[in-house]
Amino acid sequence: MDAIKKKMQMLKLDKENALDRAEQAEADKKGAEDKSKQLEDELVALQKKLKGTEDELDKYSEALKDAQEKLELSDKKATDAEGDVASLNRRIQLVEEELDRAQERLSTALQKLEEAEKAADESERGMKVIENRALKDEEKMELQEIQLKEAKHIAEEADRKYEEVARKLVIIEGDLERAEERAELSESKCAELEEELKTVTNNLKSLEAQAEKYSQKEDKYEEEIKVLTDKLKEAETRAEFAERTVAKLEKSIDDLEDELYAQKLKYKAISEELDHALNDMTSI
């Protein structure tokens, strides 16, 4: 664009110079005409006064001839100058048209740039909204991780209490042979519980694979944690009840040991599942 403007300025300068030369040629022409007229007047006067002086007549005739040649030369220069001016005018017109087209392209480019900047602003606002949502999801995940840790702590506490009960029952382990058949039934129930916990694990892994849809499954996930927490609280209550009934174990050793064995396996599996769930949450 600057090169075009410089070129246009140079062409305008050439035009002005050509106009100056044309004006100078016109002035020379006028001067020659004036001088020719003066010479003609003088020649007429001399012819009237010196009709017999051929030398003077030849002299002035030569001067008149020179003046006419200068006049013709001036006319030619003026014609050439006018042609140069016309050519420069055409070139200036072409440059101005080219400048108009360049300005039109520049205007189009500026309009496209403005549209691109608007689109970039919209994209930036969308990114900020996504970042805010991701931050909220992360905060919810941290809260649920804390809830899982609390549930694990409850499970560990339940295990500890059951271990204490088990130590108290070591002295009567010899009487627990009849509990084997019932233990098999308990193992079957534990297998069912294991399948249930595997389902929970699969749900947690599914949540990890579908992190972008986490907010939609958040209620279900919290409900699962609540169910596990309720089960652990129920187990803790049963453990406390079992501890209070240690004095009566001699009368109901078979039933109590069956319950103890089943509950111990059950809550050991729950504790392991909570560890897996916590690890899954940590890796999300």
Swiss-Prot record:
Gene: tpm1
Family of the protein in this entry: Belongs to the tropomyosin family.
Gene3D superfamilies: 1.20.5.170, 1.20.5.340
Protein's name in the database: Tropomyosin alpha-1 chain
GO molecular function per UniProt: actin filament binding; identical protein binding; protein heterodimerization activity; protein homodimerization activity
Reported function: Binds to actin filaments in muscle and non-muscle cells. Plays a central role, in association with the troponin complex, in the calcium dependent regulation of vertebrate striated muscle contraction. Smooth muscle contraction is regulated by interaction with caldesmon. In non-muscle cells is implicated in stabilizing cytoskeleton actin filaments.
Subcellular location field: Cytoplasm, Cytoskeleton
UniProt organism field: Xenopus laevis
Subunit record text: Homodimer. Heterodimer of an alpha (TPM1, TPM3 or TPM4) and a beta (TPM2) chain.
Coiled-coil regions listed in the entry: 1-284
Gene Ontology CC annotation, any one: actin cytoskeleton
Domain free text: The molecule is in a coiled coil structure that is formed by 2 polypeptide chains. The sequence exhibits a prominent seven-residues periodicity.
Stretches for region Disordered: 1-38
One GO term (biological process): actin filament organization
Record's signal peptide: none
Bias-annotated ranges (Basic and acidic residues): 12-38
Keywords noted in UniProt: Actin-binding, Coiled coil, Cytoplasm, Cytoskeleton, Muscle protein
